[in-house]
Amino acid sequence: MPKYDSHLKCSFCGKSQEQVRKLIAGPGVYICDECVELCNEILDEELFEGATQPQPQPTKVKASRSSRRDTSLKKIPKPQEIKSYLDQHVIGQQEAKKILSVAVYNHYKRLSSKLEESGDEVEIQKSNILLIGPTGCGKTLLAQTLADLLDVPFAIADATTLTEAGYVGEDVENILLRLLQVADGEVERAQRGIIYIDEIDKIARKSENPSITRDVSGEGVQQALLKMLEGTVANVPPQGGRKHPYQEYIQIDTANILFVCGGAFVGLERVVEQRIGKRAMGFVQAGEPQKREQRLVESLKALEPDDLVKFGLIPEFIGRIPMVAVLEPLDEEALIEILTEPKNALLKQYQRLLRMDGVEMVFEPDAIKTIAQEAFRRKTGARALRGIVEELMLEVMYEVPSRADIRKCVITREMVEKRSTSELLILPSSLPKPESA
């Protein structure tokens, strides 16, 4: 009879050595033959289930681009029609509008031609667009308005949040995920959309010469964007975030996606002036801000690809955004027009809101001019207008809906200067006061 030690027990089932056929010892633990058999059964069951279930596969996109037919491609607006639509929503920037109108028309005409090409015809390459201009001059609005006109998905990405693969931050493929979400998950629609990448100047490398250290949010991002801008089939994780080997991917072909990149490119004018031999901007006399802005625009109109290389963009990246449009800084007259002229002008929005309460809203010309002057001093373009007007109109929007005696409000220059509407000019109006619910 074999000798058993009654103190030795299986660490899993608790049976003693004499109750089992074999007890295997480890460093401080024991396992019996019965528990080993049970573990083997569990493993065999999982292996069997894994073999019978289909493995996760990427969502395939048909390779034949000729099948990507969209009825909207048959009705591409002409460049003059595109510019006319832009004029209704964006003030100024006439040259930039022309460049955008032609580029967008050619891009979607290129997509339309792919539906009918036989294979031996001239292939039209994609022309992405670079918008250069100060903050608040209308770069994002131009791209958004184009997408609205063409009825295509539109997504905005911030280049400053992007890093190359393997580092903390967003992968460039997450840009495509945003576009896919806007397209309600329809891959075919997303593949004809427009992506606006803002702050593209912030991913410029620090010097013209390649760095020996890794620039994961500058040159590294430019390298990561190259294939996407040119046209590739990208694997996009459906839930966003970082990729891992065992997740499913959605495949998106970027060959027909129009990329519009925008940035302020502060200091680029000095690079241009050094090349053409002009004296650096230096100091300008007080009271001449508009003259300085005009000199800045004139310098940027002489922009060449080499200037962008010296600024910090790599040549391969510049080659994939051949269309460059320089937007002008907004002067006081342009800011006044932005307040009053566009279809969705800010003052028109407030007038409509108060009209719903049966109140007529009037902004005196001097008040509008004062708002524009203050916005121009802030140097943030059209963005400053909303901040000033919302601060001014806060008390009006709070007080007027509850006042049955107010039928007409007049905003004067003094109210704008004091940032106070406590002394509203109240006049009789022909608008009926709506009954409260």
From Swiss-Prot:
PROSITE patterns: CLPX_ZB. Keywords: ATP-binding, Chaperone, Metal-binding, Nucleotide-binding, Zinc. It comes from the Bacteria. SUPFAM superfamilies: Glucocorticoid receptor-like (DNA-binding domain), P-loop containing nucleoside triphosphate hydrolases. ATP binds at residues 134-141. Residues 1-51 form the ClpX-type ZB domain. GO terms for molecular function: ATP binding; ATP hydrolysis activity; ATP-dependent protein folding chaperone; protein dimerization activity; unfolded protein binding; zinc ion binding. SMART domains: AAA, ClpB_D2-small, zf-C4_ClpX. Zn(2+) binds at residues 10, 13, 32, 35. GO terms for biological process: cell division; proteolysis involved in protein catabolic process. One of its GO terms (cellular component) is HslUV protease complex. Residues 50-74 are annotated as: Disordered. InterPro entries: AAA+_ATPase, ATP-dep_Clp_protease_ClpX, ATPase_AAA_core, Clp_ATPase_C, Clp_protease_ATP-bd_su_ClpX, ClpX_bact, P-loop_NTPase, Znf_CppX_C4. The keyword Glycosyltransferase does not apply. Gene3D superfamilies: 1.10.8.60, ClpX chaperone, C4-type zinc finger domain, P-loop containing nucleotide triphosphate hydrolases. Component of the ClpX-ClpP complex. Forms a hexameric ring that, in the presence of ATP, binds to fourteen ClpP subunits assembled into a disk-like structure with a central cavity, resembling the structure of eukaryotic proteasomes. Belongs to the ClpX chaperone family. ATP-dependent specificity component of the Clp protease. It directs the protease to specific substrates. Can perform chaperone functions in the absence of ClpP. This is ATP-dependent Clp protease ATP-binding subunit ClpX. The gene is clpX.
